[in-house]
């Protein structure tokens, strides 16, 4: 097997099936709603193992999607994809990367902090599964010192 190759994905829609099969809520035309600005994928021998997408919403840069195929979870792919998204945000002068996380502990291990600002959870609060099968937390990675 070849090593895992991480590369920017220009066609964000190519990641839809991975996101959907990973249990993420993603609808048709998601790119028109989320306004993705950066997507990164992890591939090995041409096979898609994982991906992440950063979007611009609510005047913020948001890690909207991160998914890794079940058989390769635990190998550091999700961590690497997150780090590459953070590098992208730093590279364009961003000061923070926001997310609504179903697995907040994963992101906290990477130094994300919980926030009380629930702008990203607004849609979640209207979902019938909120608080039952799904209870995401809003988190933020601060990339520059905040006052």
Could you describe each region identified by the protein language model?
Residues 89-102:
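Conserved GNAT acetyl-CoA-binding A-motif
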Residues 1-28, 41-43, 138-141, 146-147:
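Short amphipathic alpha-helix that is part of the acyltransferase structural core
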Residues 120-147:
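C-terminal "cap" of GNAT-fold acetyltransferases
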Residues 11, 59, 102-103:
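A generic "binding-loop/recognition-motif" signal
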Residues 101-129:
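Conserved active-site alpha-helix within GNAT-family acetyltransferase domains
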């Amino acid at each position: 097997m070849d090593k895992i190759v991480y590369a920017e994905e220009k066609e964000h829609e190519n990641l839809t099936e991975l996101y959907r099969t990973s249990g993420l809520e993603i609808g048709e035309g998601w790119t028109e709603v989320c306004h993705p600005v950066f997507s990164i994928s992890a591939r090995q021998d041409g096979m898609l193992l994982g991906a992440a997408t950063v979007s611009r919403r609510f005047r913020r840069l948001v890690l909207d999607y991160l998914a890794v195929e079940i058989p390769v979870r635990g190998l550091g792919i999700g961590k690497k994809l997150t780090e590459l998204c953070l590098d992208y945000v730093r590279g364009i002068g961003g000061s923070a990367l926001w997310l609504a996380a179903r697995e907040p502990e994963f992101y906290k291990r990477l130094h994300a902090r919980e926030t009380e600002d629930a702008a990203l959870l607004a849609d979640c609060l209207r979902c019938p599964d909120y608080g039952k099968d799904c209870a995401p937390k809003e988190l933020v990675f601060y990339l520059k010192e905040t006052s």
